[in-house]
């Protein structure tokens, strides 16, 4: 009997378009000799829509439902995703997706799911909290100032100008895929950047800008996590924003990255240490800055990285000899392993 994968995609965050791309890729790459795929779309308003089922490879004409093609007659209760023995693959990015909320819902349903648990998902989603945890693990990061809604913005800007130097980058604490991030060269630009970031979150991070290469490491495993050789994001634009990542195709990837063996070893060790520090499970992608001075800063841990066939995370593992379809199989197996462990603890 074939294993059922419940593919959850879409979602309420600004990264829902990326989720659809990732889900389409998974749907096409699955080994249908082993798996059946059932898909559920989460609309921008948070409704669950039962969409397609695939027992064999979809044709080129098959497309997953999006916010533009919703069939509201197929709206179901969220709990309708439950199926005995099925594994959920929540290909959801950003808030209300990889922040622990969906993970908690799936644990209430007693369903195995791919990826990090409630704690590690919510922790890694918040950039400020992640920085504080990684500081305790002794991992170097770019200098920063945290600003929370209700703070005296003028005083916080003064703190930024005392501790950091322009240019700085302003980021919503709970957001990914470069959404809401701005580069500022002066105080007026910083004020505008803060206004933009606060549109997406009530907690904001201002980081020191660094002249650095962007290097990424893939992580796979539960309690025996393994890492990939690093890959490098090569940009055609000064700032790796959402449009450059997903819409304009202004980036390329160099896999493996052209860096020394010593730097590779440090990055892989730091990535594995960071994954363990947040209690990671299943998968993550760890992003580093590598400066002209040879400094290595851990930028962020992404617990549900972009998962299209051309995304960095699957390509990193392909370089290590694990193909995209085999990577999906491995993640499903890890989901069942972590589910069994979690259930065994409930005595």
UniProtKB/Swiss-Prot annotation:
Residues the record lists as binding Mg(2+) 2: 300, 302
Known EC number: 6.3.2.4
Sorted UniProt keywords: ATP-binding, Cell shape, Cell wall biogenesis/degradation, Cytoplasm, Ligase, Magnesium, Manganese, Metal-binding, Nucleotide-binding, Peptidoglycan synthesis
A Pfam family this chain is assigned to: Dala_Dala_lig_N
Molecular functions per Gene Ontology: ATP binding; D-alanine-D-alanine ligase activity; metal ion binding
Cofactor stoichiometry and binding remark: Binds 2 magnesium or manganese ions per subunit.
Catalysed transformations (reactions): 2 D-alanine + ATP = D-alanyl-D-alanine + ADP + phosphate + H(+)
UniProt KW Disulfide bond keyword: no
Cofactors demanded by this protein: Mg(2+); Mn(2+)
Subcellular location(s) per record: Cytoplasm
The name this protein goes by in its record: D-alanine--D-alanine ligase
